[in-house]
Amino acid sequence: PSDAPNIARVVALKAGIPKEVPAYTVARNCNSGMDAIIEAWRHIQLDEGEVYIAGGVESMSTIPYIVRGARWGLKLRHAQFTDALWEALTDPICGQLMG
């Protein structure tokens, strides 16, 4: 699933890559695929391995709504849904959309 906590590990294991092979996920809003490719290139330049698999799985249109406090129960309180995409793209300093 594209929302797996460590999607790189999930993809590697499902592709038959042995569990002993390292994998890590680059988490960025829009450019994680490009960042993953750059990271692979850096490792190749440093001669830290022979083969790298890099890619991206952004799916910003499927980012969920969140309800703060729901994990521990809201106890007859008003639940407010927050659009996680809108929140992620809003600059916390000036309140304007980034991108």
What are these regions (language model features)?
Residues P1:
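Extracytoplasmic "Venus flytrap"
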Residues A4-I7, A12-G99:
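Acyl-thioester C-C bond-transforming condensing/cleaving domain
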